[in-house]
Amino acid sequence: MAKYDLAIIGSGPGGYNTAIRASQWGLKTLCVEKDGYLGGTCLHVGCIPTKVLLHHAEIYDTFKRAKEFGIDVKEFSLNWPATLARKEAVVNKHAKGIEFLFRKNKVDKMQGWGKWAGPGRVTVEKDGQVTEIEATHIMFGTGSAARSLPGVEIDGKTILSNIEILQLPAVPKTLVIVGAGAVGVEFASVFNSFGTQVTVLEMLPRITPIEDEEISGELEKALKKKGIQIFTEAKVDSVKKDAQGATVSFTDKTGKSQSVSAEKVLMAVGRRPLTDNLGLEKSQVKLERGFVHTGPYMETAEPRLYAIGDIVAGMPQLAHAASMEGITCVAKITGKQIMPPLEKTRIPNCTYCEPQVASIGLTERAAREAGYAVKTGKFPFIGNSKATILGHHEGFIKVVSDEATAELLGVHIIGPLATEIVAESVAALQLEATVDDLMSTVHAHPTVWEAMADAVAAVRGLSINA
């Protein structure tokens, strides 16, 4: 029987990053993956291929505006097969990259279905053959799958999940998206750019409901301006397929019954944890609706059994959260680095629609509900010279701070390069920086990023460019 210090079930961002760091810190590590490739949902049917399409949409939109930049383009068109081919090339490049990194860092891998088989034991089943592994520590990072609504079956042809919409043979003329979280608005943005008539149905009062209310409102306004039809407080009653596609019937916010027909329907209503048939029901692990309860260092109620990523109760289902959860856990196991437990409010949210949205920390409402005396500052990108140069000056940065101490509580961005320029704010909150700390930080000019200097100054009523 093979023996390891750590066996990780799942090779998504959480699994593979943790496996490499564990090996770097001296643990003999095995990564078990049910599929024939490493990287998980994020790399193959999630974050990475979606961002390829979003970048292609951005380029396509730039061609539409070429005349504004003094460039005459007489004719251009979207080559969808070539777009899909590049998407696959990007995915394959990075899948091979993980294989290389495993070899470089001496991480063993094994394909098959991994299960907990008792303290210190894992079984891996493939093609009817079962291999037993002994491991001092066992970690599950098995990820999640798309949810649907009761009575609505994802058939992969007309009613789609995030997997099938990435592999469509042609760009649909019409598309209904059920759900307006990150997945919903990103695909709405992509296909709107490519000429699809898009309708978004959201059950809650606003789109991107985890974001600050002002950000959600600004994004809805921007998407509607692009021609995307959005219904909030829309309760889907049924999705019925027909020869032309499907018809989605829903009750709108006034109580009126409405329907919209489209070639394709994307279900973007959240994700369910993949914790069935892992042997966890035989352990002391506490499960709630399939999610695993963990302690501050991702430990479960079963000794030396850990959980990370989308299966963890109460934590965001984000690739970068999974990675840091695993690394923090391994730091604790090995004692190689002192790392504090991962805090939910220190995990950035990034949504790559157009305009982009990014945030870190508490929203204004959450800060007030937490009892803070809140002071905010806001700076519009229309006052930023680099944003004007780029031709993308919609949106703003909003800073939420504690009036008593000036500590940064949250930063919320909608606008150009939001998912990149949020990085300063992530570091600032991690270091418990204040408004004054960032006001005394030199921001390079001209950059989109320097808008942050004006946003924090706005908290003091001292913004220069607005």
How does the language model describe each region?
Residues 9-14, 18-35, 41, 48, ...:
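Flexible, glycine-rich terminal cap/loop adjacent to redox cofactors
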Residues 19, 23, 188, 192-193:
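Gly/Ala-rich phosphate-binding loop of Rossmann-like dinucleotide-binding domains
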Residues 155-172, 259-336:
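FAD-site-proximal beta/loop scaffold in flavoenzymes
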